[in-house]
Amino acid sequence: GYLSDNYRQLIEADRYPACYRLIPALPKLLLHSWLSRLQTERFEQKTDKIMQLLGRHRKDWEHVFFIILARNFGFGTNSDAFEFWAETIPLQAVNKHRDSLFQIEAFFFGQAGLLQEVPADEYTDRLMKEYTYLSHKFGLRPSANSRWKLLRMRPDNFPHVRIAQLASFYYRSQGLLSALMEAQSLKSLRDMLRCGTSEYWLTHYVFGEASPPHPKTLSNQTIDLLVINTVIPFLYAYGKYKTDNILIQRANGLLEEMRPENNFIVRIWKECGLEAAHAGDSQALIQLKKNYCDIKKCLYCRIGYEYLKKPQCGGQ
């Protein structure tokens, strides 16, 4: 019958999304409620990850926030490497030297295994000496620098630049997590995440190779991605942890106040007739792709379910 024809058509389709023909015909209310459900599902999935990390790090919210923030500084290509690196950063030790950006850089670059590189220069040598001293003092061992990827990457995304930005960010933002949690507006959140680098990085993308001066500040788009993927999920997770519905509502409200992300997933759904109205929708569409479309869970998807019921879908 047409049910099995429709199902086979969905499962065997090599186009994404397989149900694209049906979307313009579906009621807006159905699509809206499904996206809303997916937005919550995505929050819950991110909350699970935060809770797992909290279990591993003895309920240290600041450290777990740092790990998630660092992961999102990897922007896909280096996400796993950044998460692994952030787990090795002894934040309690770093906090004792928080008034020195130079020492924070020594901790961060040393633990990343990036100070063993050549060619070196005077600044790298000073960082290396400082890291040697700090690593003896706190019993540290660097991670392998082979984890970091630089190939086919824009220089602004090089791990060196991102670590320099994280160091600068950490240096100037004491009590960061509580400040972010209490931020009253999207603008104040964005302002807190604005960060540059120390002077050396104005003329470098990697150690020892000078380049024309170029400020390494985070772009507005990058800041928004960090708000969407780090700050807002943390608000939500903390709200769940404290059973504080106001925080949960604030997380949802902030997400719905932001423009949708501009990525190929969002663009493809727009072409099919489903346009993301805000960042909550774009997060929902990412959830839909990764947790339904990619693994052919069409039977569990509201759109897939509607597709199966339509006699005219099969064989079109």
Across the structure, where does each feature detected by a protein language model lie?
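Hydrophobic, aromatic-lined core segments that form the binding pocket/scaffold
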Residues: Q39-S282
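Acidic, carboxylate-rich catalytic segments that either coordinate divalent cations
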Residues: E271-G315
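Short, well-ordered strand-loop elements centered on a beta-strand within folded domains, enriched
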Residues: G1, S79-F84, Q312-G315
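A surface-exposed, charged beta-strand/loop segment in the N-terminal or early-internal portion
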Residues: G1-L31, Q316
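Intrinsically disordered, low-complexity regions enriched in small/polar residues
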Residues: S4, R172, F207-E209, D294, ...
